[in-house]
């Protein structure tokens, strides 16, 4: 749920081979997966890491994992291509919203104004879904509204 950078794609090809699942990315991020300079692997890991993207998602698109509908919500800020995945009971927010905090915006393509707008989108979601961030505990939307100073 963030851009196709080194820590997000590290094992993607291997998982594709082992499980037969496609590697998917948001429409603006697919190019990062194949470019070790853009995805930061040469800078941070001293090793070229790339992967092939099989499917590209767009904002508002819905797909299924088994019988579960999953809707893509573009939530830029931590990265320009940040997305959250909305299911009936949970929202997978990556580093946009995570355990009473948010992802940093000082890395390439990060933008604090976009992050604020993304947090408004997430706060406006109906109900009280579980929030499954990229780090920290699973929380709920109501908990985040009460305890997260950024929301």
Model segments located where?
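Metallo-beta-lactamase
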Residues: 38-42, 62, 69-151
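Active-site HxH/HxHxD metal-binding segment of metal-dependent hydrolases
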Residues: 1, 6-62, 150
């Amino acid at each position: 749920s963030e851009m196709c950078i080194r820590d997000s794609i590290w094992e993607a090809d291997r998982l594709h081979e082992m499980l037969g699942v496609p590697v998917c990315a948001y429409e603006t991020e697919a190019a990062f997966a194949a470019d070790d300079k853009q995805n930061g692997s040469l800078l941070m890991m001293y090793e070229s890491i790339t992967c092939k993207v099989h499917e590209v998602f767009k904002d508002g698109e819905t797909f299924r994992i088994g019988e579960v509908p999953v809707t893509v919500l573009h939530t830029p800020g931590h990265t320009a291509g940040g997305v959250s995945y909305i299911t009936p009971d949970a929202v997978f927010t990556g580093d946009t919203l995570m355990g009473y905090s948010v992802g940093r915006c000082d890395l390439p393509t990060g933008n604090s104004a976009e992050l604020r707008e993304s947090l408004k989108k997430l706060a406006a979601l109906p109900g009280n879904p579980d929030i499954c961030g990229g780090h920290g505990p699973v929380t709920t939307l109501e908990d985040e509204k009460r305890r997260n100073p950024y929301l």
